[in-house]
Amino acid sequence: MPALGSQRRLLGSLNCTPPATLPFTLAPNRTGPQCLEVSIPDGLFLSLGLVSLVENVLVVAAIAKNRNLHSPMYYFICCLAVSDLLVSVSNVLETAVMLLLEAGVLATQAAVVQQLDNVIDVLICGSMVSSLCFLGAIAVDRYISIFYALRYHSVVTLPRAWRIIAAIWVASILTSLLFITYYNHKVILLCLVGLFIAMLALMAVLYVHMLARACQHARGIARLQKRQRPIHQGFGLKGAATLTILLGVFFLCWGPFFLHLSLIVLCPQHPTCGCIFKNFNLFLALIICNAIVDPLIYAFRSQELRKTLQEVLQCSW
């Protein structure tokens, strides 16, 4: 990915120089005990990508099979699974092609590899943007279902959900094309960082508000049953733990990648930033880990979806 890492992995496999260079030069890699570089083996990249691929394919298949899951909420979850699937496919494809090039099994011209690298970059960038947007859409959908329960089906209709889904995919494609075309502009990187911060803030505000409402509801039930402390405290701890896991996974998996983008703009030549640039592959691996965890958080917790998933695994179509 041209502006994201300190190297283009596919082009680096051919030992050729990219045709375009950044207007800001990244700091040279710094060595020494204070500069930690975490090496990610290609086998681990492939393994994580394949696990994520299988998980998200199962989610899409289960939602497609069960008509009871054909609702806006599950359509958003399905689109999130497709986005995570594309993240995995693009990284697996890039790693596989890179290994074939390095082994001399695949022989092709540098121009062809450059075009392939651009296609993979479009997939990676587009799937990342769509994944962030669908995480935000799921948060908004759940917020409406709690705070506007009686009006939910009139607010979140299927036609409206389809329009939102179409808008997210179109915006993701356009964003990825703009990124590939203008990757040497700092504004593009700042826009991607801004999207991450906006989604993080949106999810934090909505889920914290939902947790507060749930705790308030639990207190009301506890008063009626005259067992206020045990019920309220247990529910509050469980809700806080769920919220911590949800937002914590999002921040830990996506945060380092967007920190990397921010530092490319803020301190591209600083030695300390150069240490962080060396761990770009680690940041990509964390995003793939997020694609593995997303189905566990958003999809597999549904009893209906788990039941359908068992039928899919048993091939009972």
Swiss-Prot record:
Predominant subcellular localization, coarse grouping: membrane
GO molecular function: melanocyte-stimulating hormone receptor activity; ubiquitin protein ligase binding
GO CC annotations, alphabetized: cytoplasm; plasma membrane
Subcellular location: Cell membrane
GO terms (BP aspect): adenylate cyclase-activating G protein-coupled receptor signaling pathway; intracellular signal transduction; melanin biosynthetic process; negative regulation of tumor necrosis factor production; phospholipase C-activating G protein-coupled receptor signaling pathway; positive regulation of cAMP/PKA signal transduction; positive regulation of transcription by RNA polymerase II; regulation of metabolic process
Tissue: Highly expressed in the testis.
Transmembrane annotation, as ranges: 38-63, 73-93, 119-140, 164-183, 192-211, 241-266, 280-300
Residue ranges that the UniProt entry lists as topological domain Cytoplasmic: 64-72, 141-163, 212-240, 301-317
Cited SUPFAM superfamilies: Family A G protein-coupled receptor-like
Keyword Calcium included in the entry's annotation: no
Membrane topology type: Multi-pass membrane protein
Glycan-modified residues: N29
Keywords annotated in UniProt: Cell membrane, G-protein coupled receptor, Glycoprotein, Lipoprotein, Membrane, Palmitate, Receptor, Transducer, Transmembrane, Transmembrane helix
Lipidation (S-palmitoyl cysteine): C315
Stretches in topological domain Extracellular: 1-37, 94-118, 184-191, 267-279
Superkingdom of origin organism: Eukaryota
Quaternary data: Interacts with MGRN1, but does not undergo MGRN1-mediated ubiquitination; this interaction competes with GNAS-binding and thus inhibits agonist-induced cAMP production. Interacts with OPN3; the interaction results in a decrease in MC1R-mediated cAMP signaling and ultimately a decrease in melanin production in melanocytes.
Function of the protein: Receptor for MSH (alpha, beta) and ACTH. Does not seem to be active with gamma-MSH. The activity of this receptor is mediated by G proteins which activate adenylate cyclase. Mediates melanogenesis, the production of eumelanin (black/brown) and phaeomelanin (red/yellow), via regulation of cAMP signaling in melanocytes.
Sequence similarity: Belongs to the G-protein coupled receptor 1 family.
Protein name: Melanocyte-stimulating hormone receptor
Species annotation: Bos taurus
Record gene name: MC1R
